Every structure is written in structure tokens, then in C-alpha cells.
């Protein structure tokens, strides 16, 4: 699979450092191999020069002319409905979860730990009941190793797979 996130006009990037950290910007122009001109009319980012080392390129791209003014970038941004697309992306969801988790206080961490314990207790009980049921029935658990051996035996006999090929 070829690389698809190029530094190009209209590419949406997430600022990873500096005062714009966490904000989305659109690349308007490439100044040189280290710097680009960015603009984020709907994210509160004024048009400015920004280092590529401080940007993470996203898969999103909006169409507007080379070195377009801010009003055209804003129009293209709203037409593409980028805000909604970004909110449902796994990257955004993960960033929101990290932010939420870092803002937990001591009591919230306690509640989370308690809820995890309760969940694990329910899972353990369910697993043990299934384990006891299979032990009582006398049915062996199917392991991958046993399954492979059964398939080899069937193949040697000329079972299902051999019949399917003919």
C-alpha cells in the first residue's frame, strides 16, 4: 500500500507542539522542505508559518486553490463537513479518551477501578460456569492443535475438503 499522506495544499494536519497543540489546520502553501503556511479558520488558528516537525498529517484533504485566502479555506472547510468527520475518526476518539482519562481525580480513578473489578468478577463467574458445564458433559474443549489433527485425518481419508476440490 503506497504512502498517501502527502504535504500538499488542502491537506489537514493536527498540530502536535507549540501554542496550537491539538488543533486542526489546513496546509495552504509549502514554503520550503521544513515549513508550511497553515490556516485554521474554524479552529481558531490564524494564517501563519508552521514547522512540519510540529504537524501530524491526517488522511483528510479539502479542495481549494493554491494560496487561497482565508474566506475560501473557510468555505471549503464547511462544505467538506470536516468537523463531523474528525469527531468520529479513531484518532480523535483516542485523543478525547486520553484527555478524559488525564482529567480524572482520585475518586474517579477509584470508581473506575471498582467498576473494572466488578466487570472482571462477572466475566470470571461466567467463564467458570461454562468450564464446569463442559467438564460435567464430558465434552473436551476444542483446541487448535486437536482441530488441525482432525483436519489432517479427514484430508487423508478424502473427506470434505477433497470432495470440494473435485
UniProtKB/Swiss-Prot annotation:
<dbReference type="GO" id="GO:0042273">
    <property type="term" value="P:ribosomal large subunit biogenesis"/>
</dbReference>
<dbReference type="GO" id="GO:0002181">
    <property type="term" value="P:cytoplasmic translation"/>
</dbReference>
<feature type="region of interest" description="Disordered">
    <location>
        <begin position="135"/>
        <end position="166"/>
    </location>
</feature>
<keyword id="KW-0687">Ribonucleoprotein</keyword>
<dbReference type="GO" id="GO:0003735">
    <property type="term" value="F:structural constituent of ribosome"/>
</dbReference>
<dbReference type="GO" id="GO:0022625">
    <property type="term" value="C:cytosolic large ribosomal subunit"/>
</dbReference>
<keyword id="KW-0689">Ribosomal protein</keyword>
<dbReference type="InterPro" id="IPR039660">
    <property type="entry name" value="Ribosomal_eL14"/>
</dbReference>
<dbReference type="Pfam" id="PF01929">
    <property type="entry name" value="Ribosomal_L14e"/>
</dbReference>
<dbReference type="GO" id="GO:0022626">
    <property type="term" value="C:cytosolic ribosome"/>
</dbReference>
<dbReference type="GO" id="GO:0003723">
    <property type="term" value="F:RNA binding"/>
</dbReference>
<protein>
    <recommendedName>
        <fullName>Large ribosomal subunit protein eL14</fullName>
    </recommendedName>
</protein>
<dbReference type="GO" id="GO:0043524">
    <property type="term" value="P:negative regulation of neuron apoptotic process"/>
</dbReference>
<dbReference type="InterPro" id="IPR014722">
    <property type="entry name" value="Rib_uL2_dom2"/>
</dbReference>
<comment type="similarity">
    <text>Belongs to the eukaryotic ribosomal protein eL14 family.</text>
</comment>
<feature type="compositionally biased region" description="Basic and acidic residues">
    <location>
        <begin position="146"/>
        <end position="157"/>
    </location>
</feature>
<dbReference type="InterPro" id="IPR008991">
    <property type="entry name" value="Translation_prot_SH3-like_sf"/>
</dbReference>
<dbReference type="InterPro" id="IPR002784">
    <property type="entry name" value="Ribosomal_eL14_dom"/>
</dbReference>
Amino acid at each position: 500500500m503506497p504512502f498517501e499522506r502527502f504535504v500538499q495544499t488542502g491537506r489537514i494536519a493536527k498540530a502536535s507542539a507549540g501554542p496550537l497543540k491539538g488543533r486542526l489546520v489546513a496546509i495552504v502553501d509549502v514554503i520550503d522542505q521544513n515549513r508550511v503556511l497553515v490556516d485554521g479558520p474554524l479552529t481558531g488558528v490564524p494564517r501563519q508559518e508552521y514547522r512540519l516537525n510540529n504537524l501530524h498529517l491526517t488522511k483528510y484533504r479539502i479542495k481549494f486553490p493554491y494560496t487561497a485566502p482565508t474566506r475560501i479555506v473557510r468555505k471549503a472547510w464547511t462544505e467538506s463537513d470536516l468537523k463531523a468527520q474528525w469527531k468520529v475518526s479513531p484518532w480523535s476518539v483516542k485523543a478525547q479518551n486520553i484527555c478524559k482519562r488525564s482529567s480524572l481525580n482520585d475518586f474517579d480513578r477509584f470508581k473506575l477501578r471498582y467498576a473494572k473489578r466488578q466487570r472482571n468478577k462477572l466475566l470470571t463467574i461466567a467463564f467458570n460456569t461454562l468450564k464446569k458445564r463442559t467438564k460435567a458433559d464430558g465434552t473436551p474443549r476444542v483446541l487448535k492443535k486437536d482441530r488441525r489433527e482432525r483436519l489432517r485425518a479427514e484430508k487423508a481419508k478424502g473427506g470434505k475438503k477433497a470432495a470440494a476440490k473435485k
